[in-house]
Amino acid sequence: MEAALLLAKLPEAYQIFDPLVDVLPIIPLFFLALAFVWQAAVGFK
């Protein structure tokens, strides 16, 4: 458990990117939603 917590924490040099790293896993979901909206716009052809 401690090893996973240690790996999950970014090194101090990269602390400024911490909020960005929290958001990055969500980006593929936006692409999935975009594909759905695009298909809805063209009528699911």
From Swiss-Prot:
Subcellular localization: Cellular thylakoid membrane
Top-level taxon: Bacteria
Keyword list, A-Z: Membrane, Photosynthesis, Photosystem II, Reaction center, Thylakoid, Transmembrane, Transmembrane helix
InterPro entries: PSII_PsbK, PSII_PsbK_sf
Single GO BP term: photosynthesis
Quaternary assembly: PSII is composed of 1 copy each of membrane proteins PsbA, PsbB, PsbC, PsbD, PsbE, PsbF, PsbH, PsbI, PsbJ, PsbK, PsbL, PsbM, PsbT, PsbX, PsbY, PsbZ, Psb30/Ycf12, peripheral proteins PsbO, CyanoQ (PsbQ), PsbU, PsbV and a large number of cofactors. It forms dimeric complexes.
Role according to the record: One of the components of the core complex of photosystem II (PSII). PSII is a light-driven water:plastoquinone oxidoreductase that uses light energy to abstract electrons from H(2)O, generating O(2) and a proton gradient subsequently used for ATP formation. It consists of a core antenna complex that captures photons, and an electron transfer chain that converts photonic excitation into a charge separation.
Protein name: Photosystem II reaction center protein K
Species, as recorded: Rippkaea orientalis (strain PCC 8801 / RF-1)
Gene designation: psbK
